[in-house]
Amino acid sequence: MTTPIVHAWMPSSPCGDGCLPKNPPTVGRIVLALRIVLALAAFGLLPVLVVLGVPFPRVRRSLTRIGARTLLFAIGIDLTVLDARSERERSRTAAGALHVAGHISWTDVVVLTAVQPSTFVARADLIDWPVLGRLARAMKVLPIDRARLHQLPGVVDQVADRVRAGGSVVVFPEATTWCGRAYGSLRPALLQAAIDSETWVQPIRLRYLDRTGEQTTATCFVGDETIGASIGRIFRLRGLRAEVEFTAPEAPGGDRRDLARRCEVAIRRDGVELAERPRKDVYDPTVHEEMAEAERSPMPPTAAAA
């Protein structure tokens, strides 16, 4: 088999082991063993629940949500959902929508499924991963091979068809994982699906908090870490909470780059005008925390090149 050429637009992230917190709190052996047993049960049960509910969409969504929440409990991640949208804003995404979020870890899929079961666009090799691959196949993940640009239009068409038919599809336009403290620009390609289907876009702020309520990078899946090592490390962590916040939906408009900028402004807390002028792909707010408020630009400066 020919190895695909890595193109100039291949998504990349500078995040690595150095982004992980030093000596985070962990659970003991007994709790870890219980987590593993419960997680294996949840991993085995969730695909079954999805299949059982196939003829009945509402039942399928409810069972999928229950399975995902059980899995989150097994992993040891609590869940908080924030939603200040008006009834009118909620109604705009009730019958099909494209959901947009930043990408931190494989746990993002579990967290967002626990809130609202959806179809996910994810890296193609996820289907072949141990354990998670089975879950991905059951949830009918739309695979995308980031090394093969010619496949992108087909994926966009599939997403547009799903939301046009009333489904909810989640995309991670950063196109790769970041640590959550630093993050990348939202790439506009997949957002074309919202424009083609004339569907509203739902931005979602997703972050992970430690037991003190501060944002943590403990769950990030970055650098050279394998999926097995990441699962083992995250299962040992204690005091984690995922926070999911729904912001006001964005109209699709006619320009996917403008839509990407609007969504980026919506899902980032660090600066109202974050996406309003050209910048490099990575921003780390901790680099600039020592700046005086009076001197700080409403658009955070760039910390490093991607």
Question: How would you describe each model-predicted region?
Answer:
Residues G18-V81, R134-M139:
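A transmembrane-helix-recognition feature enriched in membrane-embedded lipid enzymes
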Residues T93-I104, D108-V115:
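Glycine-rich active-site/cofactor-binding loop and its immediate structural neighborhood
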